[in-house]
A protein has these predicted regions:
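Cofactor-/ligand-binding subdomain signature composed of acidic, glycine-rich
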Residues: 1-49, 53
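Charged, alpha-helix-enriched surfaces in structured cytosolic catalytic cores
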Residues: 30, 55, 59, 124, ...
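A short, well-structured juxtamembrane/interface segment
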Residues: 52-67
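Short, amphipathic alpha-helical interaction segments embedded in low-complexity terminal/linker regions
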Residues: 216, 221-311
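Helix N-cap / loop-to-helix initiation motif
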Residues: 53, 139, 152, 257-258, ...
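Glycine-rich phosphate-binding loops that contact phosphosugars or nucleotide phosphates
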Residues: 75-213, 221-223
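Gly-rich Lys/Arg/Thr-decorated short loops/hinges at beta-loop-alpha junctions or inter-strand turns
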Residues: 17, 38-46, 106-117, 229, ...
Length: 311
């Protein structure tokens, strides 16, 4: 028997992420290929929904960069799938962009245990968000991004509200419009992807949308901070065999130098690819490369220009 529709008054209170599409009530009766085709078809709408928020995402990137240039941090706060996606993005910044410890932070309602198992009720406790953020001792140069598919998760909303009282920049990322989360934040990104094929399972389209937005946000922020050279991850520091191979490829691609020159530069710079590129292109020693990068806030193009002026 198909599920009965909700009463009209109850349905109006539900965010779109919790809505039930009657035409999908029989997915458990579908052939497997038809089921995955339906899900894949719905997934195609997600990039289009994200594209509708690119101006807001770009504005957020520029605002975050302004603060991180002054030493601020980027902090994600969420519960369940949304919080795990924030933690994932934060954890990928050090190996990709050589960010400093604590420069990008992921807060998850319920703590590390909630990464691998549900911590019942954690998302409904705003006091947990306050405790997590108070431990960080926020400053006006920090940015707190509350992430919630419905836009009404108490943990995420409380995180943004508290962060705003400290003067930190606040951003609300929701998958519905007119949410409490976005209303509480200084900047809002509303990626409305519509009901899920499996009603209320926001690890699907909503989770994909959140991952895409955070990919855009953190990557664009790091590009603007000079963590790349063109589209190369030059802030990589080689600490194992795989990373040493990658560092060699990056330096070779950036400089056009032969293998022997690349390896010599990486050895001199203790495996720091950005420094090694500067050693080769500016024809300087490793200490000089380090000084040029420090004077250029780590931006390789500016360090190269500075080396030319000093030559």
């Amino acid at each position: 028997m198909d599920p009965e529709p909700l009463p009209e008054a109850k349905r109006e209170r539900l965010p779109v992420t919790e809505a039930v599409r009657p035409e999908w009530a029989g997915i458990d009766l579908m052939a497997t290929l038809d089921l995955v085709r339906l899900m894949n078809s719905e997934d195609r709408s997600v990039p289009e929904a994200v594209a509708g928020q690119l101006e807001q995402i770009a504005a957020a990137v520029d605002a975050v960069v302004t603060r991180m240039t002054r030493g601020g941090r980027l902090v994600y706060a969420g519960a369940g799938t949304a919080g795990r996606i924030g933690v994932l993005d934060a954890s990928e910044c050090p190996p990709t962009f050589n960010t400093a410890p604590g420069q990008v932070v992921g807060l998850l309602a319920g703590g590390p245990q909630a990464l691998v198992s549900a911590v019942e009720g954690a998302e409904d406790r705003p006091e947990l968000a306050l405790a997590d953020l108070e431990e960080l001792k926020l400053t006006p140069d920090d940015t707190v991004v509350g992430i919630s598919a419905s836009g009404r998760t108490p943990y995420a909303v409380a995180a943004v509200r508290h962060a705003r009282t400290t003067g930190a920049l606040t951003l609300g990322l929701a998958c519905t419009r007119g949410s409490d989360l976005v209303a509480a934040a200084a900047l809002g990104i509303e990626v409305e992807v519509g009901p899920e094929v499996l009603a209320g399972s926001t690890r699907l389209k909503a989770g994909t949308a959140q991952k895409l937005v955070l990919n855009l946000l953190s990557t664009a922020v790091m590009v603007r901070l000079g963590k790349t050279y063109g589209n190369l991850m030059v802030d990589l520091r080689a600490g194992n065999e795989k990373l040493r191979d990658r560092a060699e490829r990056i330096v070779a691609q950036a400089t056009g130098a032969d293998e022997k020159t690349v390896r010599r530069a990486l050895t001199a710079t203790d495996g720091r690819a950005k420094d090694a590129v500067l050693v080769v292109l500016a024809d300087v020693d490793a200490p000089t490369a380090a000084r040029l990068l420090a004077a250029s806030d780590g931006r390789l193009r500016e360090a190269l220009a500075l080396s030319t002026r000093k030559a």
